[in-house]
Regions:
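The feature captures the catalytic groove of carbohydrate-active enzymes
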Residues: 39-89, 104-144
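Short, charged/polar micro-motifs that form catalytic or ligand-binding hotspots
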Residues: 5-9, 62, 86, 93
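Beta-strand segments within the central parallel beta-sheet cores of soluble alpha/beta enzyme folds
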Residues: 17-20, 35, 88-98, 115-121
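Stable alpha-helical elements in mature extracytoplasmic
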Residues: 11-18, 68, 72, 92, ...
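Carboxylate/His-rich catalytic cores and anion/metal-binding grooves
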Residues: 1-41
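Long, well-ordered core segments of solenoidal/helical folds
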Residues: 20-33, 95-110
Length: 144
C-alpha cells in the first residue's frame, strides 16, 4: 500500500499503477451504477480486481460500501496537487466528475432531519441495531 505516501515521499511512479486502475474502473463502474442504483456516474464497492469488478460483494455490511470511487478520486486529485499538471487534471476531471455524479444521484432527504444523505449506505466495519434490536448493515446516511 505504498500509494498512501507515494507522492509525499517523492515516488509518484509507485502511485501510477493505482491511479491507472482507478481510470480503468470507470467503464465497469458506470454499468454497476446504472444496474444497481439507476445512477449516473460510476461506483466501485469495497473490493475490486484487475478484471474490473465493481459490483457489491456477498456481505452487505462491508460488500455494499460505495465510497471506494470517491476515495480513489482523492488519490487522483492528490497526484495533481503534487504535480500541478493541468493536462493531467483535464484527463482525470471526467473521472472525478463521474464519481461526484454518482453520489449526487444517491442523495435522499432524511426524514428525521431533512438533511441530504446517501442511501443506501453502510459502514464496512460496523453494524447497527434497528428499533427491534436486530443487526442491520444498510441505512440512510451512514457515517464512516
Amino acid at each position: 500500500q505504498l500509494y498512501w505516501l507515494a507522492e509525499r515521499i517523492g515516488l509518484p511512479e509507485n502511485h501510477e499503477p493505482f491511479l491507472e486502475l482507478t481510470r480503468q474502473l470507470v467503464e465497469p463502474g458506470k454499468k454497476t451504477a446504472q444496474a444497481y442504483y439507476r445512477a449516473r456516474g460510476w461506483v466501485v464497492h469495497t473490493m475490486t480486481n484487475p478484471w474490473g469488478v465493481t459490483s457489491p460483494m456477498e456481505n452487505a455490511a462491508w460488500g455494499s460500501t460505495v465510497g471506494s470511487a470517491a476515495w480513489q478520486c482523492h488519490h487522483l486529485f492528490e497526484h495533481y496537487l503534487y504535480t500541478l499538471d493541468r493536462e493531467y487534471l483535464e484527463r482525470v476531471w471526467p473521472v472525478m466528475k463521474g464519481a461526484a455524479c454518482f453520489f449526487a444521484d444517491m442523495l435522499v432527504e432524511q426524514r428525521e432531519t431533512g438533511w441530504l444523505v446517501t442511501s443506501p449506505s453502510s459502514s464496512p466495519e460496523n453494524l447497527f441495531l434497528d428499533e427491534q434490536g436486530r443487526e442491520c448493515a444498510l441505512c440512510e446516511g451512514r457515517g464512516l
